[in-house]
């Protein structure tokens, strides 16, 4: 007797994405495969996405719904220009609250602006599912805050950077933070 395993194909979830890389906007419809891989319909976008996927120090910058990729943190820092007096002041008066579960639920870790090379000592290593960040200084109540999340401890691996004025959370596994 032959037993066949029936595999239910994933419904074609056609979505569209736009991102920026090296000053160029890329837009394509995409599909998710059964193994959760993404396949872009536009071949140029697919080729660019494959190149980005191979970069172990890629910076992914989220700003007002726009995703921009940078080859490294130095390239990102030049573009962001974070050294203005107003930005420095608001960075020093900022805080972030990280949650173990999505939608701001579960255990939380509230920290002020600073460098955190390893979240293991806070019991938040590889378990952050959402976060909120804001300025805490009355002089800068609406200033944007930049939060950087790193894939590996000691600021290693890929970087996920968020410029936050109003933020609704993200689901990203991280190990270290610098803000």
Which role does the model predict for each range below?
Residues 1-179:
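Compact beta-sheet-dominated domain cores in extracellular/mature segments
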């Amino acid at each position: 007797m032959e037993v066949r395993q029936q595999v239910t194909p994933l419904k074609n979830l056609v979505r569209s994405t736009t991102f920026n890389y090296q000053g160029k906007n890329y837009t394509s419809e995409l599909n998710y495969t059964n193994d959760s891989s993404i396949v872009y319909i536009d071949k140029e976008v697919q080729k660019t996405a494959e190149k980005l996927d191979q970069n172990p120090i890629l910076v992914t910058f989220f700003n007002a719904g726009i995703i921009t990729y940078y080859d490294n943190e130095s390239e990102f820092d030049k573009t962001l220009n974070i050294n203005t007096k107003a930005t420095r002041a608001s960075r020093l008066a900022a805080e972030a609250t990280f949650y173990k579960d999505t939608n701001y639920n579960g255990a939380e870790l509230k920290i002020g602006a600073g460098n955190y090379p390893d979240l293991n000592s806070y019991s938040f290593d590889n378990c952050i599912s959402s976060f909120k960040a804001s300025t805490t200084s009355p002089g800068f109540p609406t200033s944007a805050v930049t939060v950087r999340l790193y894939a590996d401890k000691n600021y290693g691996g890929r970087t996920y950077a968020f410029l936050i004025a109003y933020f609704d959370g993200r689901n990203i596994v991280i190990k270290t933070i610098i803000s």
